């Protein structure tokens, strides 16, 4: 079973994402900011990260920068999931190492489609 780290300062968003991802057969680990997420990644690198941009302590962009420099940090597929919808944020995220970018609010279909695009879920035949 693949593991997805959900990084968001909102416990409600984490709970919704957990339900969706568990329904897609992912084991889910949660972190409420980038610092907590780095601790998780140092213990065991997940296959996927669903990442918010705006969080206290360390935001998603800075987490991504640290992640990509860690041993094994190039491996996880990172999907930003945020309210930041400007082209400058999207470009910055993708240039910084994100694999995909989705806007909140999200649903199962949106997450499944993006996870298929980055190779985390098989495309139905």
Where are these regions (language model features)?
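Charged docking surfaces used in two-component/phosphorelay signaling
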Residues: 15-23
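Short hydrophobic/Thr-rich beta-strand motif most characteristic of the beta2 strand and flanking loop
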Residues: 25-32, 40
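Acidic catalytic/metal-coordinating carboxylates
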Residues: 33-36, 59-65
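Active-site beta3 strand of CheY-like receiver
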Residues: 44-50
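Receiver (REC) domain active-site loop signature in two-component systems and cognate sites
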Residues: 55
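Alpha4 helix (beta4-alpha4-beta5 surface) of REC/receiver domains from two-component response regulators
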Residues: 62, 85-100, 110-113
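A Lys-centered signature of the CheY-like receiver
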Residues: 104
